């Protein structure tokens, strides 16, 4: 896990504990002795790319610092029904409290990683990279971004703070591409910030405007056809990175990649996923 992610992950775990356990797991408190210890296993029930084992361990350790965590496979492994990701031993009350929290996290992260791997596979043999977006569940973005990386994809910006991305609304409100880029450069210089600049374009003519304004780090081709994309890549001619976005599906993305774009951003990696089936069960 990246060092900068840890505070977000810790905060998410605390929130998950508050919303699920509240003032106590009364079911376990009333029928499980306080000193009772046991062992459970994380059983995979569906084929896919597993993700979130590292987070599951943090959840368990937060609820029981004495927990014994025996990991058997790594995040990013393709699992099949019957595979065991890890065994965990500790206070039974703590294990039962952690069960749903860690399953919710792992099932979603594994769903994102599995879906990402499908998109990455579609571009096999090409240099184009698959990017995620900011279309994530509020509060879950760090985990979604981690899962995309585990599935073989790449991360776009984390939020509004680590990259300037001039989209259509910014450009329209600023009065056009040239004044928008000029405003960005003036602002970043005044603030002493060194972050990448990306600009969305809606036509081939817009590309000329970007370079007339001094250029950017990356140009995003918004809702271009493959034919337009090929012409756009030729016009950019390697002067900056290129990205295709908008309306690109699993079925059409290779057509765009074959035009030579560096990146394709896909919102479906995180907002149209199916969680991977798994369970945490008692064992000897």
Label each residue range with its predicted role.
Residues 250:
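Cys/His-rich Zn2+-binding cysteine-cluster or related metal-binding knuckle/ribbon modules and their
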Residues 1-213, 218, 227-235, 241-243, ...:
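Acidic/glycine-rich phosphate/pyrophosphate-binding loops and surrounding catalytic core
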Residues 268-284:
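Short, charged, intrinsically disordered terminal tails
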Residues 222-223, 246, 268-269:
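Short secondary-structure boundary segments
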């Amino acid at each position: 896990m990246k060092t900068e992610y840890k505070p977000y992950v810790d905060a998410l775990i605390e929130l998950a504990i508050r919303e699920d356990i509240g003032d106590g797991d009364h079911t376990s408190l009333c029928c499980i002795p306080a000193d009772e210890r046991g062992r459970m296993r994380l059983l995979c029930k569906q084929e896919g790319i597993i993700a979130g084992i590292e987070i599951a361990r943090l959840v368990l350790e937060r609820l029981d610092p004495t927990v014994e965590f025996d990991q058997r496979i790594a995040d990013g492994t393709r699992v099949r029904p019957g595979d065991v990701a890890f065994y965990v031993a500790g206070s039974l009350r703590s294990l039962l409290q952690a069960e749903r929290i860690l399953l919710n996290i792992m099932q979603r992260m594994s769903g994102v990683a599995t879906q990402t791997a499908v998109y990455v596979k579609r571009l096999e043999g090409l240099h184009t990279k698959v990017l995620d977006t900011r279309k994530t569940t509020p509060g879950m973005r760090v985990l979604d971004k981690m899962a995309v990386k585990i599935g073989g994809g790449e991360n776009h910006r984390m939020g509004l703070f680590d990259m300037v991305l001039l989209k259509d609304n910014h450009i329209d409100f600023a009065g056009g591409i040239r004044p928008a880029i000029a405003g960005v450069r003036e602002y970043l210089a005044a603030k002493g910030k060194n972050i990448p600049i990306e600009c969305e374009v809606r036509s081939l003519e817009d590309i000329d405007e970007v370079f007339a304004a001094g250029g950017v780090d990356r140009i995003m081709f918004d809702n271009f056809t493959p034919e337009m994309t090929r012409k756009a890549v030729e016009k950019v001619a390697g002067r900056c990175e290129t990205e295709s976005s908008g309306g690109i599906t699993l079925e059409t993305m290779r057509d765009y990649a074959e035009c030579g774009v560096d990146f394709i951003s896909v919102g479906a990696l995180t907002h149209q996923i199916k969680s991977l089936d798994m369970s945490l069960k008692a064992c000897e």
